[in-house]
Amino acid sequence: SIGALILSPDVLFMRWSEMDVWSMLTWRGIEMGIILILFSSCFKIFRDNFKNIFSPVGFGIICCQIISSFFFTYGIAETSASLILFTLATSPIFASIFSIFILGEKTNNSTWITACLALIGVGISVANGDNVLNAPEGSVLIGTICGIGAAASLGLSLVLLRYQPNIPAMTLIGISALCNGFIGLLIVSPGLLFQG
């Protein structure tokens, strides 16, 4: 619930910007990347562990974060913010599944019951997705796929961070965001970059 509260203003500003998906990806990525990298560089523990980013697990987490951020941004541009946030809330389900294979953890029954209830909630949200006020006129199905894609890649990145906990997460997310910003910059039409 804390994560949803933190993400809510981000989603609100993204929607208010009325930018296309590539402009949002560019600005959000570059700004978030610079802020997180600068902020994390103020802490000795992040500076000491910086070299751990350059490992197979580190690059895997960067890829997961890039994919998650792309799906999240595209989903926000495509459909209702509530649907994206609701589907994003399924990331612990994916984290539980990935942790079985990567960490060898066993998941208890209460986790699977919670997962089923969350999926029912997503189903209800998707079924009523066309009736949301002020939502973009995009596809609810594509938005749902984007939300689930963002949740799955976020869940995998969290499990990989647990697999190698000495990787500085904040710095890594900043690098991923910066990569997303540069990807958006390569694709966005220059005329659209300053509109919104």
PLM segments and residue spans:
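Glycine-/small-residue-enriched transmembrane alpha-helix faces in small-molecule transporters
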Residues: S1-T26, C63, F71, L133-Y163, ...
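Hydrophobic core positions of alpha-helical segments in small-molecule transporters
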Residues: I2, W27, T87-T90, S110-I113, ...
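Specific transmembrane alpha-helical segments of multi-pass solute transporters/efflux pumps
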Residues: L7, F43-L83, L88, I124, ...
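Hydrophobic/aromatic residues within transmembrane alpha-helices
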Residues: S17, M24, G75, T87, ...
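Transmembrane alpha-helices of multi-pass small-molecule transport proteins
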Residues: M19-I67, F94, A152-S157, G174-L192
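Hydrophobic transmembrane alpha-helices of multi-pass small-molecule transport proteins
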Residues: L36, S110-G129, L178-G184
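Membrane-interface helix-boundary motifs at transmembrane edges
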Residues: I45-I53, I100-S110, L161-T171
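C-terminal transmembrane-helix exit sites in multi-pass transporters
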Residues: F72, S91-C116
